[in-house]
């Protein structure tokens, strides 16, 4: 499919979608930064994906609050034998079940991730176990606080970047060799517990692993008249998998604020 996409894939005129592509990253030979970001958004992850993930917000003294979620994806875009006309502008369907802490357990989020989110915005619903109520979540996008992140991440930071790219101007800065997290088998060992990983200011570096790796570098600058907590972002994208490996997020004064 990569060869077929290379010959036929095109950005829509506004850059908020693609056409003549299916199943995997559309632009194996990208010409600009926006094509690289679409390669990340549409990278191949199979037809279905299920996993359990933990997130934590460490305090200065080393204590932390942990949230555990179960994620279940169905990738309409990557289904064998499908085409763009069949998927009804959907990339994937996602159900997230919160397992812990007990105060949040039972919370369920359902997302229909759309391809062109300007034409048809992301659809999201959230079931609150405490009130036993199901509500639409129309603002689950852009700079809105990512649920259960203690306001440390925006929604569009999930998976390093997601959603419509229309708030930024994207520039491809070329390729660079940098040290990035890669093949950190110790960190992902099933016997490793959160207490083994989490430290007051960063993860336990005895478990981390880094490689000198060639990446695409993409810079995103906030468009005039748009409001977002990040005025500039730099993305380092794996040239093999198109997974964003690291990012830098800058505040309104163009000072480095966060890294992911």
Residue spans for each PLM region:
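Context-gated lysine
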Residues: 1, 31, 90, 95, ...
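Gly/Pro-enriched, hydrophobic low-complexity segments
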Residues: 1, 5, 9-12, 95-163, ...
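Solvent-exposed N-terminal domain segments of exported/luminal and surface proteins
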Residues: 1-121, 128
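Short, charged N-terminal helix-start/capping segments
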Residues: 22-56, 136-177
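A broad, low-specificity signal for short, low-complexity segments enriched in glycine/proline
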Residues: 55-58, 83-88, 178, 194-198, ...
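Short N-terminal helix-initiation segments at or just after the protein's N-terminus
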Residues: 63-74, 152-165, 178-183, 208
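Active-site environment of non-heme Fe oxygenases that use a 2-His-1-carboxylate facial triad
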Residues: 166-204
